[in-house]
């Protein structure tokens, strides 16, 4: 007999968000070896500025050689480490986070808890702030992985704060109160609000007015405020990034023990494989408990050593942040212009590694069933893995998250060519031969049958 965790289906793996990934992994596009494969546009990964980091590593071979002042530090890094983390690394992280926020916020390393990525950080916070069956309110659309990260092992429930396209998905007082009341009607004990700023999947930064509203709301309700700020260094256009800590400081709530921030180097530096994340909190009990829990997901000492040196180079970090934002802006503009040529529009965005794309005009009907059918066609026939809005708990059918920073310029052009061919074909034009060939139709049909078993209701 296995545990309920093993035999249950609460992980969320049957979401279209994960199903699209599975199909991509079976048949990934390659510019030379598999030009008819699926292009991965469902992965929020930043590969646009790797060359800057690689150049720095070439110029600092002693870091990869695990040396300091020409002496080996291998032994001290290889032995057991205090799970509070290397002081040099925490100092460097504090300065880097401050630089992103233009030093309007200062970070105290004693209030930091290092974790193996933001997934671990968010889950650890749920363990610290809520009991099984308690609820957190999250603005929707939201990152599909939260259904796994926040709920699966903790037993915490998520109640969506319904935001709408008509006002650019702004968080409103009415939407907050509605979510809170819905939670109470379901006998859920609301423990806090969690936001992603900038938003995943919208690619927009939360405004100062929204943050002020959120802090007033959580303070009035006496609940926690969690701000996941892993995309804070990707804001490439106005309005500039504003941290919840900055607004809290202005509201004389700077030392509030119910305000917590999550950060990671996965998006800003494009290092998800390094598994570097952290929790920042003024709450001593949260910091203490989270530090103990971090022993289940530590950052390797070698990784901390490398990044402490990298992030301590002020000239490098300044240049990297500026150049990375420039490249993100250019790539986003290329995606938006390519989609526009095909008659497709996007939500106006200023941050992140993705766009929130409006395909409502391509739906056969204004339903999530129609969205699911369109998504299946885009993955199967067009060969693009994108994330449907229903997987992000969007209330309106026809919106999709499309990632743009995890591929080369050449692959982006292939994707845009496929989109245009698909739209032309839908409009009665002739579909281009960049789509799937006849040889693979039988495989597609088998997969369509599998996808059809996933109902829209289960994804919402």
From Swiss-Prot:
The keyword Transport does not apply. Substrate binds at residues 45, 83. Its cofactor is pyridoxal 5'-phosphate. This is 1-aminocyclopropane-1-carboxylate synthase 11. Its EC number is 4.4.1.14. Induction: By indole-3-acetic acid (IAA) and cycloheximide (CHX). InterPro entries: Aminotransferase_I/II_large, Ethylene_sulfur-biosynth, NHTrfase_class1_PyrdxlP-BS, PyrdxlP-dep_Trfase, PyrdxlP-dep_Trfase_major, PyrdxlP-dep_Trfase_small. The modification N6-(pyridoxal phosphate)lysine is found at residue 267. Optimum pH is 8. It catalyses: S-adenosyl-L-methionine = 1-aminocyclopropane-1-carboxylate + S-methyl-5'-thioadenosine + H(+). CDD domains: AAT_like. Homodimer and heterodimer. In vivo, the relevance of heterodimerization with other ACS enzymes is however unsure. Interacts with GRF3. GO terms for biological process: ethylene biosynthetic process; fruit ripening. 1-aminocyclopropane-1-carboxylate synthase (ACS) enzymes catalyze the conversion of S-adenosyl-L-methionine (SAM) into 1-aminocyclopropane-1-carboxylate (ACC), a direct precursor of ethylene. It comes from the Eukaryota. Pathway: Alkene biosynthesis; ethylene biosynthesis via S-adenosyl-L-methionine; ethylene from S-adenosyl-L-methionine: step 1/2. Disulfide bonds: none annotated. Belongs to the class-I pyridoxal-phosphate-dependent aminotransferase family. Keywords: Ethylene biosynthesis, Fruit ripening, Lyase, Pyridoxal phosphate, S-adenosyl-L-methionine. Expressed in roots. The stability of ACS proteins, and the regulation of such stability, play a central role in ethylene biosynthesis. May be processed at its C-terminus. GO terms for molecular function: 1-aminocyclopropane-1-carboxylate synthase activity; pyridoxal phosphate binding.
